[in-house]
Amino acid sequence: MAKVKDCPGFETFGVDVKEARKAKNLARKDLAEKVNIDTRYLANIENEGTIPRLPVIIQLVKICGLPMERYFNPEVMREESE
């Protein structure tokens, strides 16, 4: 699996997923079940900087309500925040 250091734009992905999960009052186990991944794998995404495969990214982004552009087009997000 790729790590954050290898994937520009994904520096905050794990933290974003974790914060969104908590904001939606979802237990890690519940989110992992919705995405059909192991709870430990989700913990690695949230805490260890593991970048999952694209289908998992898409599901996490949809369920958590995260903006896809933040990860795949980070320059646009930076320009909008300035």
Could you say what each language-model-derived stretch is?
Residues 15-34, 59:
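Short basic helix-loop element that most often maps to the first helix and adjoining turn
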Residues 49-62, 78:
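Short, basic-rich loop-to-helix N-cap that marks the start of a DNA-contacting helix
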